[in-house]
Amino acid sequence: MITPGERRVVMNNVASLSMLQAITYLLPAIIIPYLFRVIGPEKFGLIAFAQAFVQYFIILTDYGFSISATKEISLCRDEHAKVCKAFSSVMTVKIALAFLSLLILGIIVYFIPKFRNDWLVYVLSFGAVVGNTIFPVWFFQGTEKMRYIADINIIGGIIVAVFIFLFVRGPQDYLLVPLIYSCVSLITGLWGQYIVFRRFRVSFKLQGYKNIRRQLAAGWDIFISIAAINAYTTTRVFTVGLLTNNTITGFYSIAEKIANFCQTFPLTSFSQALFPRLSKIFHRNKIKAFKIMQRLQQIAINIALICLPLIFIFAHVIVRVVCGGDYQKTVLSLRLLLISVFFISANAFRVQFLLVCGKTHIYSRIHVIMAMVGLPLIFLLIYAFSYVGAAVATVAIEAGIFTITYFTVRRLRFS
């Protein structure tokens, strides 16, 4: 069992991340209806499409450090020299990847008409990539100081909301939306860096090729997995935008935001808070860590079986409150996506355990296989059934991941 001290640390981190996730999704629940009415569904859909597009660059700059660097920091956090070396190596790679991302963005915007026509939206949205690159969320997770993540992002979210309500007054102001998000993202990223240098006394030193290569190797399997996951998550909104229009993209993206809230709060917060602690427990006692995972997974399943049917029944009410109207496209999409949320909830701790016990290659293989199946499935179903196809594809993919992971983890043996 987890000791009282370990439980207290985990629960403090759960509280911080849960508050962060609540604000992260509740603020858009206030902002989205306002933006939808003020700038209109077409511009709203364009911004959602741009956000989905730049998400690919966020994935690239994150690489796999959200897992690999978190784990490394959690294991060496009492050795200051090793922490500084890890921090410097990770930040060097992330900054280099950010410059590569900017180059790719420039090429796409210049040569592809769909992007060139609204180039300023994509350029302004790219600021979120820079902010995410420099914000050391992985460092705070590894040191189990999640309250810094929560405090910074909650304040940032409130600033975004205030600025949008003050300055976005009509369709002509739609460019201010990505500008505000990007500026605040940059500020929060710099704030996070300040805390790392000032509070943790971490120093940045240029690292040699050997250390950089080691970080790239450590994060590779995770990066491939995350890239594969986003091949069938971020790609849904992106593909809806490519194959339909900005208005339909707006309706569907709202449904995804609501479904993501149901998935993230508080499940993702709890799994993120537990990951560094469970990694340390596994290092000492493999059987104990496995039993903790099984117990937590069953709790997550029970909660999902209680909450998700209620959300399904009252989906039309939720959509009316969030969106300010009875949008049947959004209601139908949400109800379908809730089925996928169940499979995600029933698999959250189980699939994370593959990372805890160092089976990153298996974790990667599962998601790469599902990406290879899911990506063409998404395009085919969206082409045939529009936004409904995106939701149906999501259910099929998450059910497949659940099934493969369940039987894979059952076969694990620990000595």
What positions do the PLM features span?
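Membrane-water interface segments that mark the loop-to-transmembrane alpha-helix transition
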Residues: 12-24, 50, 55, 59-109, ...
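Interfacial segments at transmembrane-helix termini and the short loops linking adjacent helices
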Residues: 5-6, 109-125, 313-345
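Hydrophobic alpha-helical transmembrane segments
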Residues: 119, 126, 150-200, 256, ...
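Helix-loop junctions and terminal segments of transmembrane helices
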Residues: 62-78, 255, 259-284, 351-356
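Helix-terminus/linker motif at the lipid-water interface of multi-pass membrane proteins
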Residues: 27-43, 166-169, 230-261, 277-280, ...
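Membrane-interface junctions at transmembrane-helix termini in multi-pass inner-membrane proteins
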Residues: 119, 129-153, 339-368
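Signature of the first transmembrane helix
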Residues: 9-66, 161, 221-247, 370, ...
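Interhelical loop/hinge segments that connect adjacent transmembrane helices in multipass membrane
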Residues: 1-10, 174-181, 187-233, 277-291, ...
